[in-house]
Amino acid sequence: MPDSLQITSVAASKGPDDIEVEFLETQSIGKESDSTHAASVMIERGASCMVTLGGDGTNRAVAFAGVDVPLVPVSTGTNNVFPVLVEGTTAGLAAGVVATGAVDVAAVSTLRPMLEVHVDGTRRDLALIDVAISRQPYLGARAIWDVDQIEELFVSGVYPTSIGMASIAASLPVAVSEGLHVRLGPGGIAVSAPVTPGMFSTVPVAEWSPLPFDEPKTVSLSSGTIAVDGERSIVIHANQSAEITLVRDGPRVVSIDRALTAAGRAGGFVR
């Protein structure tokens, strides 16, 4: 795909001559579908591992390609939960030992859950971290910050270090680590959550319950917008029905620590 900053070409020019580098010739329309298409092409070309540079949205777009290739998601922004902050050299090394078969992929990676959004029985979107149901009737700037407009929240897991909507679920006194369904509003408790970097909000929570796998939950709000991983993407009308389902078959994510540990123990770095 287009690389206006020439990150890949500069990196390739400084690498060993015996490493073959192929650049994908794909058209860009400046939307998240560019990442989905690029991932699809890589899968077709037989990629053994993919490194993603971006945030939750970038990885969500890659997941749309039906990725069954291990991912090394590297965070390049703020307010992210799915990708990790890691030094690029070690991330690339982990991807290398996975791609070359130097380690057992199943032993050094985890199949992450995700949330599917269905409207009137058709899958319209997915989220890797959270789905927020907002009373706001239009998409607008897409990014969702106003907690007062949130009716309910679905999370794929309880992530203690999360920022954003998922931090609300992580601030609850719960023992589960998997999916959770949270209804916001009066009548319950209030939690302090970092919904934006550097800022904490007091959020009223009416109730919460575990979100079992493969059991669709109907959205209670009759009209409004659905935000996936922090961005509004779908408008729902009064004559429509929306459901959120937690599924197990999300992206397979490489643990950089486990991959490098396994490679080292196997003598992969001995020269």
What residue ranges belong to the model's regions?
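ATP/NTP phosphate-donor binding region
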Residues: M1-C49, F64
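ATP/nucleoside-binding phosphotransfer catalytic cores, i.e., glycine-rich phosphate-binding loops
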Residues: T36-H37, G188-R271
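Short, acidic/small-residue loops that bind anionic groups at enzyme active sites
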Residues: A61-G88
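ATP/pyrophosphate-binding catalytic subdomain of soluble kinases
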Residues: V103-E207, L211-P216
